Amino acid sequence: MAIRTQYENSNEVGVFATLTNSYALVSLGSSCNFASVFEAELMPQIPVVQTTIGGTRVVGSVTVGNRKGLLVSSICTDTELRHLRNSLPDSVEIRRIDDRLSALGNVITCNDYVGLIHVDIDRETEEIVEDVLGIEVFRASIAGNVLIGSYCRFQNKGGLVHVKTTTDEMEELSQLLQIPLTSGTVNRGSDVIGGGLIANDWVAFCGMSTTATEIATIERIFQLSRPKEFDPSVSNSHTLRNALIDTLI
């Protein structure tokens, strides 16, 4: 299930939230509806933590994580770090990263097993990513774009990459990640996939402008299927909501 939402008037949901198989972070702000969309779909199985990072709302841009760990930018305050540690599962290791490329969500992207990082990221940061998240990492770019986290999104079963990614490049990345990939867009033609889309292994959240065709591509490549222990009535309500939105955009 891929669910449309927005943060206040922005369709860049990946800028304001981070989603993994064990937790979700959403920006603390005036948009109560944004957090409630995540809570309705994920809780109580997955905690949804409302927070800021360094006093900013761009939580998705300055954090990156998976089910095993969470990396936050050096701008994260001690109070925010303590809040995260008190709110996330004990099994999730949290580390603050001091790197000149501080927008971690734009320069690192990963699933539970492997990650792609900006070609110029510090070697020390690379080692921390591998250690805290428990993954193997590769330096890469997407369709000539070094902001790897902005132009692709993947989880454990598949991934979406920049629409101008070549076939050869996509095949190489697919072999590195060991998952199928396809090129596409979100938010009615936007190629900033990481900004407009977040996903774990059973649900994705995308901007309100995302078309039905884009939704279909997302659901197919990510092989989204709801775990049996989740209440199917919630999924049915979102199906009806998406159908209504399709008639309006």
Curated annotation (Swiss-Prot):
GO terms for molecular function: ribosomal large subunit binding; translation initiation factor activity. InterPro entries: eIF6 (IPR002769). It is found in: Cytoplasm; Nucleus, Nucleolus. GO terms for cellular component: cytoplasm; nucleolus. Transmembrane segments: none annotated. SMART domains: eIF6. The keyword S-adenosyl-L-methionine does not apply. The keyword Membrane does not apply. GO terms for biological process: cytosolic ribosome assembly; ribosomal large subunit biogenesis. Keywords: Cytoplasm, Initiation factor, Nucleus, Protein biosynthesis, Ribosome biogenesis. It comes from the Eukaryota. HAMAP family: eIF_6 (MF_00032). Monomer. Associates with the 60S ribosomal subunit. Binds to the 60S ribosomal subunit and prevents its association with the 40S ribosomal subunit to form the 80S initiation complex in the cytoplasm. May also be involved in ribosome biogenesis. NCBIfam families: eIF-6 (TIGR00323). Belongs to the eIF-6 family. This is Eukaryotic translation initiation factor 6. It comes from Babesia bovis.
